[in-house]
Amino acid sequence: MVFIKVLRVHQEKREGTYMFKNEFATLCNAGKAKADFLEKNKVGYFVSALMAGLFIAFGGFITFTWGANLTINGAPAMVRGAQSFSFAAALSLIVMAGAELFTGNNLVMAGSSLGGSVSWGETIKLWIVCYIGNLLGSLISAVGFQISGVPSGDVGAYYAKIAETKMHLAPQELIFRGIFCNILVCLAVWCGFKLKSEAAKLIMIFWCIFVFMICGFEHSIANMSVLAVGLMNAGDASVSIGGYIYNVGLVTLGNMIGGAIFVALPYYITAKEPKK
C-alpha cells in the first residue's frame, strides 16, 4: 500500500511538471473546432461573429448611457466605478450565450496555431472573418440604438464627447491601452478553460473586466459601436470617420498583441513539454 501511494505521488508530480498542459490542450481543441466551424458553415460562423458585435455593443451602451446619466445628474465621480460594473455584461453574454469575438479569438487561435492544432493561415482567415462580422454587428447595433432615440440630447452629447476623447489619444496610448485591455479579456477567456463552474467563470469575467474598465483601457470591438454613436451625435465635437478608423485600427493592433503575444505565447511556453 505504501509503495502504491509513493507511485501515485510520483505520478502526480510528473503530471504537474508541465503546468496548464491540459488547459492548453483544451484551448487548442477549441481553436480547431472554431476553424472547422468556419470551414463547414461559413454563414453560420459569420452570423455568430455578427452576434458578438451586438453583445459587445450592449455592454458599451449600458456603460456609457449610465455614465451619461450620472454625469447629467451631477454625479460624475461615480461614473468610472459604475461603468466598471456594467461592461462585464458584454463578455458574460459572449461566453454564456455563445458568439465569436475577435479579441477572445486572438488568444484561442494564436494558442492553437502555436500548439499545432491549426495553421497560421487558418487563424488569420478566421480573424479576418470574425473581425468583419464583429464590425458589421457593431455598426448595425449603433444605427438601431440611434434610431431608438436613447442617445439624444445630453446623452448623445456625452457619447460625442467620449468619441472625441478616444479619437485624439496618442498612437502609443491607444496601442498600449489595447494591449492591456486584451490581456485582461483573454485572461477571462483563459480562466473559462480552467474553471468548471459557470458561476466561477462569471466571477472571473467580472474581475477582469472591472480592472480594464477602471483603468480606462481600450477594446476595439466595443469602440466600433460606441464611436459610431458618437459620430451620429457629433454636434460641435471634433469627431470624424478618419478618427474612427485611427482609433479602432490602433486599438485592434494593441488587442492582437495583448492576446497573442502576452497571453497565448506565455501559456504555450509554460504548457509545452521540453524535448528530451
Q: Can you annotate each of these PLM segments?
A:
Residues 1-18:
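Short, Lys/Arg-enriched N-terminal segments with co-localized hydrophobic residues
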Residues 16-276:
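Alpha-helical transmembrane segments and their helix-helix packing motifs
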